Amino acid sequence: LRRLAGLRRALPPLIAAACPLLGDDSAQLVHYAVLAEATGARLLATNNIRYHVPSRRRLADVLSAIRLRCSVDALGQAAEPNAERHLKSPAEMARLFARYPDALQASLDVLATTRGFSLDHLRYEYPDEVLDPGLTAQQSLEARVAEAVAARWPVQVPDAITARIAHEMRLINDLGYAPYFLTVHEIIRFARARGILCQGRGSAANSTVCYVLGITAVDPEKHDLLFERFVSASRGEPPDIDIDFEHDRREEVIQHLYERYGRDRAAICATLIRYRPRSAIREVGKAMGLSEDITARLAKAGWGPGREMSLAELAQDEGFDINDPRLAMTLELAEELQDFPRHTATHVGGFVITRGKLTELAVVTQAAMEDRTVLEWDKDDIDALGIMKVDVLGLGMLSCLRRGFDLLARHRRLALNLANLPRDCAETYAMLRRADSVGVFQVESRAQMNMLPRLKPRAFYDLVVQVAIVRPGPIQGDMVHPYLRRRQGLEAVEYPAPDPAFGPPDELRQVLGRTLGVPLFQEQAMRLAIVAAGFTPEEADQLRRAMATFRQQGLVTRHKEKLVAGMTRRGYAQDLAERVFAQIEGFGSYGFPESHAASFAHLVYASAWLKRHHPAAFACALLNSQPMGFYAPAQIMRDAREHGVVVRAVDVNASDWDSSLEEAPESTGGLALRLGLRLVAGLAQRDAEALLAAPQRESHSATEEELAILSAFGGIVAFN
């Protein structure tokens, strides 16, 4: 303390003192006052606060019991002796420290030094490594966009594209987001230089700048996507780009980010796990000393979304005596504990990168996984502070497609990638209409297979709808059957018109024409609000957010009143306005953005095309990319056989670790599928590699002992 007192500081060292009313407060305060005088420190009046109101003392004891893994009755000295550790009023603090006015003044002085502080003062700066020499971030981005536009449209750039890029670049410049786009572009360039398949998705697909830079594969102009769904001046938060990489090569990208920016400047953000009804009941029940069978029954009753009854009502329905004091207190405290933070975990892929040291901004810890560091803030904290986040995600289908392309390059000398696949292949769409989609991305589930023959996709946009329509949102909003009836010509497509004084009669057709008058996407919900109810783009985005945050019922109600009033004012019928809102509300939390569905539709088409034209390569790539998808290896093999592919058994003389292709005129496409040793149940890769490295493997003859050992793995093994 004396050494600290000798340093030049805005405030001298402080000794925090509290009056918890434990009987020895006076002696403790005298001791601290003497210590402060002897060291040149100041006494600081505090209250060692743990909860905001006295009634939270019981919950504080329960949390202590949960942390210490004991019951409340066994807490001993770890229990709160009284309820004094709460936020007290200035009058209460003045009474407690009446003999130490300097301690009260010290608290006021500390408050004065922090009075002007705001979280807005935590300034975030984008990385500057991505800038081109001699150029600002905006100039660097403009140069890269111009180069990419010239490469994509070498003859003439469409006017609509030019206008969209100008609009986006203006907004990017105003908001200072150019370094963000440059950083993401650098990540994409690194991955492609390494031959790693990648594709941006989510709201980033609403951006033409992202499209021309190759970050996303969706043309927003073609799909009439709103840029404000991605970047909005009113939101005051940075853009958020999700990028899918091959799931078994994502680690290369993650380690590249660490190497390029340093572990003191790059980390994966945390995700906050909160108490839900079941976990709250279990933890509080244990702390309160309830038996395991009682807590299990209560937890089961409280399980599931959309619970409307209180825990006490649920317990009563289960036959419990809710007048029992211990049970009643348990249920009350479990209600209080819900939505409390329980623990942090590592986000699936949200990477934070800064110009300065991230460790000076927040706590960065070592993750459980090797070579990973975690920022102890979640995505909501990061959004609130305007910090750049890039989601580096893994997608199994990208690994599968890359393996398929590599196999075709090796065996058929075809140089295929996601950009040069033949488009609008009638045979591919015909295969999908038959629901022949085992292994095909996003449309291989039973629900999707049932929908394919009903929707009958014939063009790319049909795949966009296919991806989006089999979701809880469209189903809850009663949009699926009207869309299918209209698509099949069983129901007339109608577009109600506003009062002629307020707009053209076809304004709803412009929004819903491609989906036959039925809103299927979040972007359509936003456009409906703008066109039919007079919302601004920023208000429409707030509506989308209110829908997504379904717990904030007050916000939803206000938006409903505004939307219904806006539509009726412009001449639409009241029942239509309420029906439109009900549809928007139905898929607000579970519906797909059109940009996201379009990004996934590209992979649907690519995987379907590969399956239709090169079934052996597709099946081989699927097997080598496991685990992924819905189907086990045996089902993938059976499907390959049904498509005329010859499937050859595992053979120690012919098989590698991965499955492979062999020339076979009798097989579809002239290629047979040779199963790999990885499919032998229980066979470790290191053991298989030792077998493969054995000399003269081609002339290997298995002994009875070897047969017994290998047969124990449960696989199909053939020997010469």
Residue ranges and their predicted role:
Residues 1-60, 95-98, 143, 147-150, ...:
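Domain-core and long-helix interface of multi-subunit machines
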Residues 58-140, 694, 704, 713, ...:
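Active-site or pore-adjacent capping/gating segments
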